[in-house]
Each structure stands twice: as C-alpha cells, then as structure tokens.
A protein has these predicted regions:
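Acidic Gly/Asp/Thr-rich repetitive segments characteristic of extracellular carbohydrate-active
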Residues: 53-84, 89
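Short glycine/acidic-rich loop motifs that flank beta-strands on beta-rich extracellular proteins
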Residues: 90-96, 114, 119-124, 143-149, ...
C-alpha cells in the first residue's frame, strides 16, 4: 500500500468516526413530555428548551411569570385555555374548578416552575374540572397533597417532580378516564401515588421512591 493511499484511507476513517461520535452526543430538545421524558432517565435539557406540549390549543394562552399568581390566571381562564407557568418559585394553592384547563410548567435550561408550600400550605394543586391537564411542575414542602383530584374526569397528570410533600404526592379520586405518567415522586409520608374510587386510570412510567408506599390503587376499576 503506497503512502498516498494510506493517508487518504486514514482521513476517511477519521471523518467517519467523527461523524458517528457527533451524532451520539446530540441531545434531543424536549418540546413535550408526550415522548416519555422523565426527570432522571429521559431527555437532556439544552439551552432552547420549551416543555409546552404539542397539542392543539383551542383557546387563549395565559403566561404566568414569577411574582404573578397562578390562581389569578386560573380565575381568568376560559375552558380550552392553556396557562403557561414560567420557571420560578410560586407559594400558593391552586384550585381548578373549570373544565378544559391546561396548566403547564415551562422548562427552560433545566429549570422548572416550582410550587413551594414552605411547610405551611396544605395542598399545591386541587382540581375538580373535567379535561384538566397538569404537567411539568416541581412541587415541594406542602403539608397535604401535591396534586389532588376530586371527581374530575379525563385528566392528565404527567412529567411532574413532587418531593418532600405531605400525605400523597398524586391523589386523584372519584374520577374516570385519567392518565398519570412520567412523574417522579419521593419523600411522601404515605403513598407517592394513590388512586382511590376511580375507573379506568392509566398509571405508567412513574418513578417513586423514599416514601412509605409507592403506588396504591384501591376501590378502583380498570
């Protein structure tokens, strides 16, 4: 093999290896939690991340910034509206008693919208409306429950991180047709996820640990 041929072959091999190595290091951008991203084992965040789900938005989009009230945005919202909560800390309890409300935390550079109960507030998010979506929040230091449903149907609770919070991390009850997926729940005094007196609730791909109980489903049918 002559010297010129050896040099050309070495360049080709090096270029091929560089391209393959570059492809392996490209981190996908999270545009939605629909693809199965989880807090630990899912996609890597990059500098241009937007975790607003890719779903058809029928109504208006209301943006909540740090210093604003999430509850006030819920009160302003009409059925079909999406409330986007920007990264920052919010210390309040949010009640959703309307149908078709999407409450979505925006993830930017790995930072989430964080609801902090400061060890004083009872519950973080309570909903009784139908077709409610809650996703992408970090919830901590509430005395009662992280996300609790009371008779809301067709709900989705996904891609939330709930740590060191009260009695139950995620607690839908008296509901029908719900989805609880890709949440990370830990440090809960009772069950990380508790499904009570509900029908057709799909619980999948959640990470639960360091709680008294993991996933508890009682008096429910699938």
């Amino acid at each position: 093999m002559n010297t010129k041929f050896k040099v050309v072959l070495a360049i080709v091999i090096f270029a091929g290896g560089w391209i393959m190595g570059s492809n392996n290091n490209v981190a996908p951008v999270i545009t939605s939690s629909m693809g199965g991203a989880s807090y630990n084992g899912g996609f890597k965040a990059d500098n241009s991340i937007s975790a607003v789900p890719q779903r058809n938005v029928e109504g208006s989009v209301i943006v909540v910034n740090p210093g604003d009230s999430i509850q006030e945005a819920v009160e302003m919202a009409q059925p079909g509206d999406t409330i986007q909560v920007m990264p920052g800390t919010y210390s309040e309890t949010v009640y959703i008693d309307k149908d078709d409300i999407h409450l979505v935390g925006v993830i930017r550079e790995g930072e989430r919208a964080t609801m902090d109960g400061l060890g004083k507030l009872n519950d973080a998010i309570l909903y009784s409306g139908n077709n409610v979506v809650v996703e992408n929040f970090r919830i901590t230091q509430y005395k009662g429950n992280g996300i609790m449903g009371q008779a809301g149907n067709n709900f989705e609770i996904r891609n939330n991180v709930i740590v060191d919070t009260g009695i139950y991390g995620i607690f839908p009850q008296l509901g029908t047709n719900g989805l609880v997926e890709h949440n990370v729940v830990s440090g809960i005094e009772d069950a990380a996820i508790y499904i009570g007196m509900s029908d057709n609730i799909h619980v999948a791909h959640n990470e639960v640990f360091d709680s008294v109980a993991g996933i508890e489903i009682e008096n429910s049918r699938h």
